[in-house]
Curated annotation (Swiss-Prot):
Changing residue 38 to A: 2% peptidase activity, reduced substrate binding. Its EC number is 3.4.22.-. This is Ribosomal processing cysteine protease Prp. Disruption phenotype: Essential, it cannot be disrupted. InterPro entries: Peptidase_Prp (IPR007422), Peptidase_Prp_sf (IPR036764). Belongs to the Prp family. One of its GO terms (biological process) is ribosome biogenesis. CDD domains: Prp-like (cd16332). The active site is at residues 22, 34. Optimum pH is 7.0. It holds the Pfam family Peptidase_Prp. The keyword Hydrolase applies.
Length: 106
């Protein structure tokens, strides 16, 4: 199962997103849950870097299964909007594939 741990500060701003695990919905290379979640995450990170002044701290495993993004500037409204959009997309995947992906808010 993919777990997505989301840390939100007292102001409701996303500070950390950690995605761990594997969806195990299909064969390696043919897992639509993994592909969807990965596309949402990587697309969002690329949008933050390409469209805003935010430069988040990023840590990931080259072999897959772990990605951590930490917001450096939680007052960057554009980056926060992209992060919130990412979470809505991941929630949509979770609603359909709740045995393969779980979002946890902290």
């Amino acid at each position: 199962m993919i777990t997505v741990d989301i840390t939100v500060n007292d102001e409701g701003k996303v500070t950390d997103v950690i995605m761990d695990g594997h969806a195990d919905h299909g064969e390696y290379g043919h897992d639509i849950v993994c592909a969807g979640a990965s596309a949402v995450l990587f697309g969002s990170v690329n949008a933050i870097i390409g469209l805003t002044s935010e430069r988040p701290d990023i840590n990931y495993d080259d072999n897959g299964g772990h990605f951590h993004i930490r917001s450096v500037d939680t007052n960057n409204d554009e980056a926060q909007l992209i992060l919130q959009t990412m979470l809505v997309s991941l929630q949509t995947i979770e609603e359909e594939y709740n045995e393969n992906i779980r979002l946890n808010y902290k």
